[in-house]
Amino acid sequence: MAQPRCWYAHGHWIQGHGCRVIPSLAFVHIPINATDTLQAQAGDRPNYQPGINDEVPVCQQSQGWCRDGRYDWDKPECRYGGHDELFMRALASTPGVMGLFYGHNHGNTWCYRWDTLLPGMAVEGNGINLCFGQRTGHGGYGNWIRGAREIVVTRDKLKDFSVDTYMCLESGATVGAVSLNATFNRDWYPATPNDETETQT
């Protein structure tokens, strides 16, 4: 199997910025393996990682793929093929990346700070915050309330590589407000309600 090329790992986007650490955020559709491992290890901590945690385990990148590139969900050794390891290494080795944001799992809306080597993983986290969004559209599965994760970026907070984020729901409510900073995972927050809406036909 050909080795995947990770455009992110090459760092060409840093050139021309005086080689200083640039605060940044990353966005993908499907969560990385560290998300599934954090969920399994930490469990449900609604006052430290507020959000809905209804989809266990996380549907993640490389799910159902064998290491040799074959898709075979029925083989236990192919439940996770490791094809996102290069991307995780690039994220964990890039200074200034404050958060990775994704969706895909409609029933998960939490964030978690990945700052250790997790059991069964070959990549050690560097303090990047991993965050789900909120179910946004009227298609797809589930009856979780629709909304959006909003990310508030200010110059003052960027000096400390910190951003604020919360969910703005279709009901008008704001839930899950947290500061993604050096003490996230240890700071206490109100739990997020698990609200649902009727599916429109």
What is the predicted role of each segment?
Residues 72-75, 108-201:
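Binuclear metal-dependent phosphoesterase catalytic core
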Residues 1-109:
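His/acidic metal-ligating clusters that form di-metal
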